[in-house]
């Protein structure tokens, strides 16, 4: 992966062409849990990008020295170490957000996207392409999180990043917040609409009828 075109493709392809959530249906649980606010969705995106990119890099770096029988354990050990770093940094510098994200930072360890890229790509590729692949898949995951988080916070509370955007009835405005948007089912609906929109734009992603 030497050309700028290939690097660009590796980073941008997971956003629409091969999105981990919208096409592969991976990492959905955290997408439901951390998208009530745009702030938590953004921080979770950065966390997953960091873990996916660096775990890919380190797994690729030692891939030729990992016995096949313990490769999954080694991958999980690397991922877990990076997740612990992220968790400690959040607790030290963004404690309130860390509390809101709760156990879902720790559950990055079991995120199918992170494990999947380490096994499917990093074990077969050089370190730099693996790092870029991790960034791209983290970005694709974050694209869905941030999109869903944007609509859930805006429609659910009339705010973005805790700043009032839609004038609330309680403050003399016209917007009555939709409480449903703050509940997990709304994330299912929004992810469904997003998948539909992507497949309208990218009809080749529609499954062939049997």
Curated annotation (Swiss-Prot):
InterPro entries: NqrD, NqrDE/RnfAE. Its EC number is 7.2.1.1. One of its GO terms (molecular function) is oxidoreductase activity, acting on NAD(P)H, quinone or similar compound as acceptor. NQR complex catalyzes the reduction of ubiquinone-1 to ubiquinol by two successive reactions, coupled with the transport of Na(+) ions from the cytoplasm to the periplasm. NqrA to NqrE are probably involved in the second step, the conversion of ubisemiquinone to ubiquinol. Belongs to the NqrDE/RnfAE family. This is Na(+)-translocating NADH-quinone reductase subunit D. The keyword S-adenosyl-L-methionine does not apply. It is a multi-pass membrane protein. The gene is nqrD. Composed of six subunits; NqrA, NqrB, NqrC, NqrD, NqrE and NqrF. GO terms for cellular component: plasma membrane. It catalyses: a ubiquinone + n Na(+)(in) + NADH + H(+) = a ubiquinol + n Na(+)(out) + NAD(+). Keywords: Cell inner membrane, Cell membrane, Ion transport, Membrane, NAD, Sodium, Sodium transport, Translocase, Transmembrane, Transmembrane helix, Transport, Ubiquinone. The chain crosses the membrane at residues 11-31, 42-62, 72-92, 103-123, 131-151, 178-198. It is found in: Cell inner membrane. The lineage of its organism: Bacteria, Pseudomonadati, Pseudomonadota, Gammaproteobacteria, Vibrionales. GO terms for biological process: sodium ion transport. It is an enzyme of class 7 (translocase). Its main location: membrane.
């Amino acid at each position: 992966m030497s050309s700028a075109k290939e690097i660009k493709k590796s980073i941008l392809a997971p956003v629409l062409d091969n999105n981990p959530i919208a096409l592969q249906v991976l990492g959905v649980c955290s997408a439901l849990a951390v998208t009530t606010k745009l702030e938590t969705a953004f921080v979770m995106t950065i966390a997953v990008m960091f873990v996916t990119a660096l775990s890919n890099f380190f797994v690729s770096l030692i891939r030729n020295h990992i016995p096949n029988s313990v490769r999954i354990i080694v991958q999980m050990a690397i991922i877990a170490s990076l997740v612990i770093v992220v968790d400690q940094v959040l607790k030290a510098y963004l404690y309130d957000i860390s509390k809101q994200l709760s156990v879902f930072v720790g559950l990055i360890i079991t995120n199918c996207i992170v494990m999947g890229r380490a096994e499917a790509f990093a074990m077969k590729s050089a370190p730099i392409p693996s790092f870029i692949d991790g960034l791209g898949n983290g970005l694709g995951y974050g694209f869905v999180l941030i999109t869903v988080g944007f609509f859930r916070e805006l429609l659910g509370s009339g705010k973005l990043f805790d700043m009032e955007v839609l004038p609330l009835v309680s403050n003399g405005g016209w917007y009555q917040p939709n409480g449903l948007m703050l509940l997990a089912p709304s994330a299912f609906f929004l992810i469904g609409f997003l998948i539909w929109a992507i497949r309208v734009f990218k009809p080749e992603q529609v499954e062939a009828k049997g």
